Amino acid sequence: TMMGLLTGLAFGLLYAGLGVPVGKLADRANRRNIVAVCCTVWSLATMACGVAQHFWQLLIARMTVAVGEAGGMAPSISMVSDMYPRRQRSLVISLFMMGPHFGVLIGLAVGGWIAQHHGWRAAFLWFGAPGIVLGLLVWLFVREPVRGGFDGPAEPPGAAAAATESL
């Protein structure tokens, strides 16, 4: 159905398909910049969902949200990994990974209220706007952490590292 395309296939394929290439980019480029740009892109695209006048505009906006969101996770986890020593990483990354789940919980409750009182388009506009500010704040105030700053000597790559190296 059209709703399935908007909420599943169009979003999911792009999000999943871009995860590895963005992860590889995050290994080579400034992660802070990737996160800031992707946050801004997905926020602008979220707002574009609220002003879409046709199905195809909404579909393209949702696909653009997926592109932005796909670029946010790998660089963020990489940065968090470089900000904490190994013994604390599991806890810190677990706390970080709770964010999207709490976001969905809050988004459904608050978004439902906004949609009921102001229309579904307003919900997209209200939820997109803060991300633009957040992207700018990340760009201006978050520093790129030193890669491996808390790591000791490198360990030999395992089977997973060898397998992904060919990608």
List each model region and its residues:
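MFS 12-TM fold signature
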Residues: 11, 39-46, 65, 130-134
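Cytoplasmic helix-loop-helix junction between adjacent transmembrane helices
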Residues: 61-102
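Conserved MFS/SLC helix-loop-helix module at the cytosolic interface between two early adjacent transmembrane helices
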Residues: 17-53
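Helix-loop-helix hairpin linking two adjacent transmembrane segments in secondary transporters
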Residues: 96, 100-146
